[in-house]
């Protein structure tokens, strides 16, 4: 800076009370810029002003610097004499201007007072003498000296240098307030000024500000003719083709959508249900497994495919090393007692059994009032043997003599069992006529014998189970059933006595028991029908209390030759069995025990085979009576759908029903039928 350069200091005050210091005065530039000053002074109040910021905070200084630049000011990084204003946040900056030119250099007055107060007198002998001072106390003198010697602004600081150079000092609070006021004035000026401008100028400014670029082919662009709206465009990957075969609601350009749907649907085929059977995994799962990436901690490397990594040499060497041989030896000694988790075990379909798939028939009747005879027909099973010549084995009914141990024992038991035999249909055709004649032979005599049985009027409790080979009450279908049936039951019946002490108590009814009260059954008959397909077993019970109970005991596949009551209870179970418990309540009758014993003995005498059957009820009764100790039994008759239940119910009279039920429900034992 030239020392000869002249500076013009304007002592006028700037707006807001801030004194303005003009820089170098250049008349040539002033004459050119006189026209632009009023416009810029309104929009930029800090135009041509230079500021120096003495602030320790960087964020505050940056924010203040931005505001100064928005108002037209300029910020310098170095303090010099060209600076217009110094902004500081120190306390001294608030009263630096009010104190005036406070300098750390001693003033002439202080120097003069120091000379006069010095203890040494002057030796020059001049006539000039200091005026007499008023004697002050020692405290006042110390206070005055402290005020004079105190420096409000330390020497060689930024503030002291600014004062010596004539730079205006402003506190940060003052400059902030000034900037806020100017911003409000500018906002009011913008609102009051002409806000409406020419649309062409606005459009020109927007077009200049908008980003421009070239569109890549193929593209679709729509422009406005008046250019009042900006154009809109769409860049395409391929040239679209119009499909005229589409319907009205659909767009003619919607050709790529079904292709995209097909691409998405291709990796989503449903896995085949036979995939597990063939031993292969579905295709979809294989694709997902290949895409999976991972990191092998053993090899310390990433892999793209798990299977390929496991087959690599590096992983094999690690897996086949002998480092973990000790651990393998310990693990091999452990007992394998892991339990398969439910989700790992394959779900098995539950096999549904019908009611007549496999069952047995047994009936127990308990008489508590009058002493009766006790009967037991025990099953004697025989092995399934098929002769090589195709002949059927003989069916045996063995009936032992009835023995009366005690007249006062009121319990009876009847157990019927049959063992199925499977044969070819050709082996049964030859025995059709013979079986029909033998089974229909002794029916009239059976009717006479069974009608003599005393009716069961006492309270009774029975268990009814339906066997795989059902009891059928149709005479006409018996002849057709023998030739067409695949399996012929092979059974034997044994009658013996049981004492009331050996009888087991009746079990309590479980939660799955259905109760039928006598009140509900007073006005109608309840029919129990058990069987598979068209095979039916019908029981007509009127005015009786019934309890139906379901159970699941069954028998094993192989049958022994002979079995007693104790042996049959220990047979293995493997098939479903249904139980029906009947609680029969009847009126009590006092019958002579000796008369009933004579009737019982005459009922089970051997009957002739030459007699013919008279009704479907007697055909059923014929199954339980034999003409001798050994006779042929060729199976049960089938009661088909064509022959209704009405024929059976008409013949089933009150006397026959009571006598038949006494035969079925004559055992007090609570033991269930084991199975065939």
Swiss-Prot record:
The modification Phosphoserine is found at residues 312, 354, 359, 418, 627, 669, 671. Residues 1-40, 98-132, 253-281 are annotated as: Disordered. Induction: Up-regulated when cells reaches the G(1)/S boundary. Down-regulated by gamma-irradiation. A motif (Integrase domain-binding motif 2 (IBM2)) lies at residues 657-676. It is found in: Nucleus. InterPro entries: Acid_Pase_AS, Replication_Regulatory_Kinase, Znf_DBF, Znf_DBF_sf. One of its GO terms (molecular function) is nucleic acid binding. Residues 40-128, 154-179 form the BRCT domain. The modification Phosphothreonine is found at residues 273, 345. Residues 21-40 have a biased composition (Basic and acidic residues). One of its GO terms (cellular component) is Dbf4-dependent protein kinase complex. A zinc finger (DBF4-type) spans 289-337. Keywords: Cell cycle, DNA replication, Metal-binding, Nucleus, Phosphoprotein, Repeat, Zinc, Zinc-finger. Zn(2+) binds at residues 296, 299, 309, 315. Residues 113-129 have a biased composition (Polar residues). Phosphorylation increases its interaction with PSIP1. Forms a complex with CDC7. Note that CDC7 forms distinct complex either with DBF4A or DBF4B. Such complexes are stable upon replication stress. Interacts with MEN1, MCM2, ORC2, ORC4 and ORC6. Interacts (via IBM motifs) with PSIP1 (via IBD domain); phosphorylation increases its affinity for PSIP1. This is Protein DBF4 homolog A.
């Amino acid at each position: 800076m030239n020392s000869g350069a002249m500076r013009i200091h304007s002592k006028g005050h700037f707006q807001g009370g801030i004194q303005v210091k003009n820089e170098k005065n250049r008349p040539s530039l002033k004459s050119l810029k006189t026209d632009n000053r009023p416009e810029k002074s309104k929009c930029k109040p800090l135009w041509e002003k230079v500021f120096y910021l003495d602030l320790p905070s960087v964020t505050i200084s940056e924010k203040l610097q931005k505001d100064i630049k928005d108002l037209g000011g300029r910020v310098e990084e170095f303090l010099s004499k060209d600076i217009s204003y110094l902004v500081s946040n120190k306390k001294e900056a608030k009263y630096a201007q009010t104190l005036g030119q406070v300098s750390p250099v001693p003033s002439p007055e202080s120097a003069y007072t120091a000379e006069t107060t010095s203890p040494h007198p002057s030796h020059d002998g001049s006539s000039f003498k200091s005026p007499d001072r008023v004697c002050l106390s020692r405290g006042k003198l110390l206070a005055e000296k402290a005020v004079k010697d105190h420096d409000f602004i330390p020497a060689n600081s930024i503030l002291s240098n600014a004062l010596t150079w004539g730079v205006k000092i402003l506190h940060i609070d003052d400059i902030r307030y000034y900037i806020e006021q100017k911003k409000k004035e500018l906002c009011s000026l913008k609102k009051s000024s002409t806000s409406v401008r020419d649309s062409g100028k606005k459009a020109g400014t927007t077009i200049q500000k908008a980003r421009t670029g070239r569109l890549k082919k193929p593209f679709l662009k729509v422009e406005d003719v008046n250019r009042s709206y900006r154009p809109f465009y769409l860049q395409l990957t391929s040239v679209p083709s119009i499909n005229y075969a589409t319907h009205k609601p659909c767009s003619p350009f919607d050709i790529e959508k079904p292709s995209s749907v097909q691409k998405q649907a291709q990796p989503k085929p449903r896995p085949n249900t036979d995939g597990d059977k063939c031993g292969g995994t579905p295709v979809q799962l294989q694709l997902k497994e290949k895409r999976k990436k991972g990191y092998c901690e053993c090899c310390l490397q990433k892999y793209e495919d798990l299977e390929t990594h496991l087959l690599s040499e590096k992983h094999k060497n690690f897996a086949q090393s002998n480092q973990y041989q000790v651990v393998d030896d310990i693990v091999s000694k452990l007992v394998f007692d892991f339990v398969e988790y439910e989700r790992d075990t394959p779900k098995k379909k539950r096999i549904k059994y019908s009611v007549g798939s496999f069952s047995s028939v047994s009936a127990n009747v308990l008489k508590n009032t009058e002493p009766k005879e006790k009967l037991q027909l025990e099953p004697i099973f025989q092995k399934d043997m098929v002769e090589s010549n195709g002949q059927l084995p003989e069916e045996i009914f063995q009936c032992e003599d009835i023995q009366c141990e005690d007249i006062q024992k009121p319990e009876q038991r009847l157990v019927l069992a049959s063992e199925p035999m499977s044969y070819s249909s050709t082996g049964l055709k030859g025995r059709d006529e013979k079986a029909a004649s033998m089974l229909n032979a002794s029916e009239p005599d059976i009717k006479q014998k069974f009608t003599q049985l005393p009716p069961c009027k006492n309270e009774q409790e029975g268990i009814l189970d339906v066997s795989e080979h059902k009891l059928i009450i149709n005479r006409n279908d018996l002849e057709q059933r023998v030739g067409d049936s695949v399996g012929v039951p092979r059974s034997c019946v044994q009658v013996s006595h049981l004492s009331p002490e050996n009888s087991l108590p009746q079990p309590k009814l479980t939660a799955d028991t259905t109760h039928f009260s006598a009140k509900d059954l007073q006005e109608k008959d309840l029919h129990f029908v058990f069987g598979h397909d068209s095979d039916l077993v019908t029981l007509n019970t009127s005015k009786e209390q019934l309890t139906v109970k379901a159970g699941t005991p069954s028998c094993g596949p192989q049958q022994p030759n002979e079995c007693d009551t104790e042996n049959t209870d220990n047979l293995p179970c493997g098939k479903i069995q249904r139980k029906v418990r009947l609680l029969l309540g009847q009126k009590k009758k006092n019958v002579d025990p000796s008369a009933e014993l004579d009737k019982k003995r005459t009922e089970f005498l051997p009957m002739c085979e030459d007699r013919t059957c008279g009704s479907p009820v007697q055909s059923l009764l014929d199954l339980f009576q034999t003409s001798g100790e050994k006779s042929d039994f060729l199976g049960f008759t089938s009661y088909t759908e064509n022959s209704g239940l009405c024929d059976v119910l008409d013949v089933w009279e009150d006397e026959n029903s009571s006598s038949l039920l006494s035969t079925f429900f004559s055992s007090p034992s609570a033991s269930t039928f084991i199975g065939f």
